[in-house]
Amino acid sequence: MKNINPTQTAAWQALQKHFDEMKDVTIADLFAKDGDRFSKFSATFDDQMLVDYSKNRITEETLAKLQDLAKECDLAGAIKSMFSGEKINRTENRAVLHVALRNRSNTPILVDGKDVMPEVNAVLEKMKTFSEAIISGEWKGYTGKAITDVVNIGIGGSDLGPYMVTEALRPYKNHLNMHFVSNVDGTHISEVLKKVNPETTLFLVASKTFTTQETMTNAHSARDWFLKAAGDEKHVAKHFAALSTNAKAVGEFGIDTANMFEFWDWVGGRYSLWSAIGLSIVLSIGFDNFVELLSGAHAMDKHFSTTPAEKNLPVLLALIGIWYNNFFGAETEAILPYDQYMHRFAAYFQQGNMESNGKYVDRNGNVVDYQTGPIIWGEPGTNGQHAFYQLIHQGTKMVPCDFIAPAITHNPLSDHHQKLLSNFFAQTEALAFGKSREVVEQEYRDQGKDPATLDYVVPFKVFEGNRPTNSILLREITPFSLGALIALYEHKIFTQGVILNIFTFDQWGVELGKQLANRILPELKDDKEISSHDSSTNGLINRYKAWRG
C-alpha cells in the first residue's frame, strides 16, 4: 500500500477548485437541470439492493474528480494488497483478511505463503457440528436437560457484531433464547442471570487472548453463579465454550478445549462476526442461514474487488463521504434504518467506522492536516423523526444521512409497512428540496388565512432543504442481503482509510485508558486518600471512596 497525503495530490487541488464552484449549487438545482438524475446516480446490486445517491450535492464532474483522487491514492493497489493477504496493518504487522472468512469461492488466500482457507473451513465445520448438537437438543447440560438459553460474553467486536446480526435476523431465529453481556458493570450480567437457568444455559466466552478485563470478569462471575447450582467444576465443560486462541487459559477455566473455537490475528475485532465470534449467530439462526450471511458478504467482496470505481458502490459511498467531511466540513454522518430489527446497526458501525478511521496520525507517522473519520450515529426510523431530525432539517450543521429500508417486511401487519416506507421516502425528499417561504405563505392562503397576520411565524416553517442523503433500499432483510449490506459499509470504511492515508485496522486509541484503569484499580481497594494523580482525578477518586462507605 502506498502512503500518499491526499491533500498533496493534483486531484485534491482540483476538488478544492470544484468545491468553490459547487458550494452554492443546490440539490434542487441539480434535479431541475437533469430529469434523468436518478438513473445516473443510482445502482442496483444483485437485484437485492438499490443504492440511490442522487440526492447529494454532486455532479458527474464531482464523481470523476473524486475517482481521480482514488486513483492517485492507489486505491486499486490497496484493494489488491488486502485481498492478497499483504500485511497492511503495519503497526501490528498483520494481514487483514475478514474477506477470507466469507470466501465462499474457496479460492486460496495466502498469508506468509500459507493458504488460510483449510483452517477457515475447519473452524466453520466445527461450528456447524457444535451448533447442530445444541439446537437439536442432543447436547445436554449437567442434569440431562437440553440447552434453552445462550449467553454471549464479550465486548467490542465480540459483542456488537453478533448482537446486531442476531437482532437484525430475528425473523430467522430458532427456539434458543439469546443474551449478550458486555459491560463490566455488574448490573449487566446480574440482570441476564436473573433470566436464565443454570441447568439449561450455555455461556460463550469471546476473548481471543482470554485475558480481556471486562469479558473475563463477567465470565468468572458467570462461572461462580453456575457452580453455586452445579457444584462440581467438571460440569463447567458442559455449559461453557470459548471463542479464543489461548488453549492454556481456556483449559484452566474449566472449558474443554474441544469446545474452543479459534480465529486468527488477521481477524480484527470489529470485523470478526464472520469468524468463530459469530457462533452466537449460528446458534440463533442456524448454520445454513449463517452461510447465507457469509455468501452475501462474499458477493459484495467480489463486487468491491472487481468493479471499476465509477460503478463500485462501497467506493462511491466512501468518496461522497470524503467530499462532505473534507470540503463541506460535515463532521458527522447519520445511519437511519427504517426497520426495527436493525436497531443496533448504527451502533455497530459507530464502532466499525470510528474505531477504524478515528486517527490523527497518517501512515507516515505525521499528524494529518485534513479531516479523517466522521462521527457516526443514528437510530431507527420513525423514532428518530420525533427526536433529532429537527436538527437535521433546520439546524446549522450539515448531517449527511444514509436511509436504509426493506421493500418487504417480515411483519405485514395492516398498513404499518406502507406508513413506515412513506416516511422513509418523504424524509429524503424533504431534506433535499425543503419548503420555501412562498410555499408556506400559499399554504396559509389555501387555509383562508392572511399570511401578513402570521408573518412572525412564517420563517420558522421554512425548510432550506439541500441536506444530502443516500437511500439504500433492500428487497428484504435476509441473511444474504444483510451480509452484503455489512460488507458494503466495511469496504466503504476501508476505502476512506486508504485515501485518507491512515491505518484503518489498528486501534491504539483504546489502550491508554485501559493502562490508567489498571493503575487506578489497586488504589480503589482501600480507603486511603489518593494524591498520585491530577487534582481532578484525585478529587473524584476520593469522593467515590467517601461515598461508597
Swiss-Prot record:
Annotated compartments: Cytoplasm
Annotated InterPro entries: G6P_Isomerase (IPR001672), G6P_Isomerase_C (IPR023096), Phosphoglucose_isomerase_CS (IPR018189), SIS_dom_sf (IPR046348), SIS_PGI_1 (IPR035476), SIS_PGI_2 (IPR035482)
Keywords, comma-separated and alphabetical: Acetylation, Cytoplasm, Gluconeogenesis, Glycolysis, Isomerase
Residues found modified as N6-acetyllysine: K80, K228, K234
Reactions the enzyme catalyzes: alpha-D-glucose 6-phosphate = beta-D-fructose 6-phosphate
Principal location listed in the UniProt entry: cytoplasm
GO terms for cellular component: cytosol
Family: Belongs to the GPI family.
Protein name: Glucose-6-phosphate isomerase
Organism name: Shigella flexneri
